[in-house]
């Protein structure tokens, strides 16, 4: 009888097990850690500020929240995965019997740290860790998995050190600032990155409040044939005669007063003569780079109208694997990356697909693929580039081929990624521009003919691309010295717009541009400022700071200007990269930071004065102390000034409501549960109900109920 060796493959997500298993032989067993297995203690710093040695703890299972119904508790327990202790016990038991242990956690620094934690725990439990091998793959395909197993490596200790340094820095700043701000202004948290995001939102709000619009006028002509003319140059004699003092000539002329524009209008005749037709110029429009995490987030927010957390969730599903024709298949590569790089081998596969599907004329040139803009070069200096851009694993699996085999959300996001990837390897679109120049009493105008000569990548990307501003004129209609009559001469008023509030897409763009945050943290950053009531979404889209957010941003900016700023965060990311490369010592860096930070922290404890707003004539019914206004996570409230000795809170007039969660449906914007609500105005439902997002008022998604629909209630609890 032949003894077969046994092997263990350790991954993070249990959702990957079925997808990976089909590429392995029967002697492999897959064990999922379900994310991190150890972390710093939840309620203490977790290390001293002398040697910074972390005190790791096994992550404890979360307890059900207070007020959750017995039914919901039972369902929670029934659906719960194994706790971390059970996972570790199972892993240790299997590892002791295994001949080889492959640590296949995610291919980034956090994944490297999880592998190290597994390695360290196994070592503590007496497992022979010489059996451990670190492997990585950026996509779950047969080729990638088998290639990774064939090329194992050691755990990158410097990567682990960099990740643990980030964790300790965030703990230092988060714990110390959060404790201070909680005691002074009742703000729940003040993390390093979330505070920068809040600073961006607050500064933008200040610019909006200070904004003073500037007005200007343009003189626009519409000929009887519908051709639109733009004023390009005013007769010099007329300009001198009328005494224009402020004129700005760009592509056209802007008048600073309506009176100036009116004076020029009065000196125009009805006839506009063509005096020149320019030689046609060709202009190319190139496809954008393949997606990285930030650009996928921005595009899906803008084009699919999704929230950031939903994008992260659906992308993870496509990466871990979906069931298609009874087979588990991963559709995209690792979705957390700051790289736009793809391998030449993969690129050739896509180029061949383009040639076969659309024709050789649609294949991108090599010079086009090798080209880099100045912006790209500047941005790449901030990129870790640990793995490739987000792309379909098999480009031949078209969106249409899986449309009816995966969920509508999965299809929408896969189509977005697939289209962007294929478009990148397609030829540029080519436009032809011709300027037709007119003259009227020595005042010069022009019209533009802008037509698409070759669609190139727009053949597949038009649905997602910004609309082309094409102006198609019949060039045969125009000839030198031919005159045209005006239908209308319009004086149009314009005004500058205030800076736009951040959306989730533009906030991600701003954070990335400044080198703040990582691909794995964008959605969390955007979500936490809403959850903490530091900002709200206006019209479900635009970030606006709340009163609490403004107070927090003000105190942080006033007392921690050297910490809560983009330069510190950028420099910190650079140092973390250097630690990952082994050129900077982590403890020395942490010690230097703590020496400076602790000094500023002590000053802030003295400088920040806790403001209390007493309510005249109102006393606590329990202890007779005066009532005060306070700011909480869910907004302002009235409570006892003798807190925490007395915990009286004045109840609002709103009565407790029963929350009924709808079975089997989620919010299309943020993926939260939907709740049955009662409309104020009568609709066609007899009981006047509709579905609304449980994340209201942060998310205002609603969905109507059919009159005859009687859905099963999932959960019911009183709040």
Swiss-Prot record:
Complex and partners: Monomer.
Gene Ontology terms, MF aspect: DNA binding; DNA topoisomerase type I (single strand cut, ATP-independent) activity; zinc ion binding
Keyword Isomerase set for record: yes
Protein name: DNA topoisomerase 1
A single Gene Ontology CC term: chromosome
Active site: residue positions: 334
SMART domains for this protein: TOP1Ac (SM00437), TOP1Bc (SM00436), TOPRIM (SM00493)
Keyword Cell wall biogenesis/degradation: no
Biological process annotations from GO: DNA topological change
Cofactor dependence: Mg(2+)
Species of the source: Mycoplasmoides gallisepticum (strain R(low / passage 15 / clone 2)) (Mycoplasma gallisepticum)
UniProt keyword terms in alphabetical order: DNA-binding, Isomerase, Magnesium, Metal-binding, Repeat, Topoisomerase, Zinc, Zinc-finger
Domain Topo IA-type catalytic: start-end pairs: 156-601
Domain Toprim: 6-137
EC number: 5.6.2.1
Residues reported to bind Mg(2+): 12, 106
Highest taxon of the lineage: Bacteria
